[in-house]
């Protein structure tokens, strides 16, 4: 099945078919706490546009990508965070499990390097 035609859990959240712990929403994106948190603070910012991953982004998505990062930063600042890790997995081998572009924001503990 084509990944673009699959209805992901994130699309169901966007469509309000399933609930989420929403932190922010506008006409371009939605942000919510990750239900499988990997840090004390772990939220996701996802575009409402159905983009599978960074691999499928086109030049016209540049402003949207910047907006996603800006929104995540705004949320982090509203939580008084001064340190966080930003992660985008692209493809199954990188750890992407939901094939709808999403940015992880993680904080609240010391992050190790390398992450993989």
Predicted segments with their positions:
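HIT superfamily nucleotide-processing domains
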Residues: 1-116
């Amino acid at each position: 099945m084509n990944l673009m035609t699959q209805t992901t859990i994130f699309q169901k959240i966007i469509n309000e078919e399933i609930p989420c712990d929403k932190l922010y929403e506008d006409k371009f994106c939605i942000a919510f706490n990750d239900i499988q948190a990997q840090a004390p603070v772990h939220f996701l910012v996802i575009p409402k546009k159905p983009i599978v991953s960074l691999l499928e982004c086109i030049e016209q998505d540049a402003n949207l990508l910047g907006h996603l990062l800006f929104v995540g930063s705004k949320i982090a600042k509203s939580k008084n965070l001064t340190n966080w890790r930003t992660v985008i997995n692209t493809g199954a081998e990188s750890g992407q499990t939901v094939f709808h572009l999403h940015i992880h924001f993680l904080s609240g503990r010391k992050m190790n390097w390398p992450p993989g």
